[in-house]
Amino acid sequence: MSNQIKLLVGLANPGLEYKRTRHNAGAWVVEELARIHNIPMREEAKFFGLTGRIQTNGQDLRLLIPTTFMNLSGKAIASIAKFYQIKPEEILVAHDELDLPPGVAKFKKGGGHGGHNGLRDTISKLANTKEFYRLRIGIGHPGHKDKVAGFVLGKAPTKEQELIDAAVDESTRCLDILLKDGLSKAQNRLHTFKAE
């Protein structure tokens, strides 16, 4: 059974200084999809972000990269969801994931925020529902929680970045499977992928 996902969000911090930092990995998924479909992402003040729209597998899919800071992402997501009457379970949020290594990505439905401020605010602004889909892009972990802030706001070394980029590419391919054939088939493919 297919999933009626109507909104894909890529979490990020705004500004050039953050563009290639690990915390912006979610936005790279949306940027890659927009590039593949050759559509521009436009600033939309009422949605506090960059928006676009693509057609994939006969479905309309709205794209959003919030231009709020990460910890205010929910404001942008809630605004566009309310305007287009998109339910939480029709939203897929792509985000960086400390608990997965670079080169790995996983789909998930529901769950907590795992300390991710973008997810925390999204859950809060969607009336505390956790039932949206997530696309977790592995960035690895610095080894100690005290180093996390500097790590996520830093740029990955070239080899790690290549692994993350490969996982982003595979994620965009598996998104088509998610939309067409459902979560378990998309998970079966994406969860066996590991960039080397």
Swiss-Prot record:
Name listed for the protein in its UniProt record: Peptidyl-tRNA hydrolase
GO MF annotations, alphabetized: peptidyl-tRNA hydrolase activity; tRNA binding
NCBIfam families named among the record's database cross-references: pth
Residue(s) at site: Stabilizes the basic form of H active site to accept a proton: D96
Upper classification of the organism: Bacteria, Pseudomonadati, Pseudomonadota, Gammaproteobacteria, Vibrionales
Site (Discriminates between blocked and unblocked aminoacyl-tRNA): N13
UniProt subcellular location: Cytoplasm
EC code(s) of this entry: 3.1.1.29
Keyword Hydrolase listed: yes
Top-tier EC class: hydrolase
Assembly and interaction partners: Monomer.
Positions bound to tRNA: Y18, F69, N71, N117
Record-linked Gene3D superfamilies: Peptidyl-tRNA hydrolase
Gene Ontology biological process terms from the UniProt entry: protein quality control for misfolded or incompletely synthesized proteins; rescue of stalled ribosome
List of catalytic residues: H23 (proton acceptor)
Reaction catalyzed: an N-acyl-L-alpha-aminoacyl-tRNA + H2O = an N-acyl-L-amino acid + a tRNA + H(+)
Main localization category: cytoplasm
Record's GO cellular component terms: cytoplasm
Superkingdom: Bacteria
Keywords attached to this entry: Cytoplasm, Hydrolase, RNA-binding, tRNA-binding
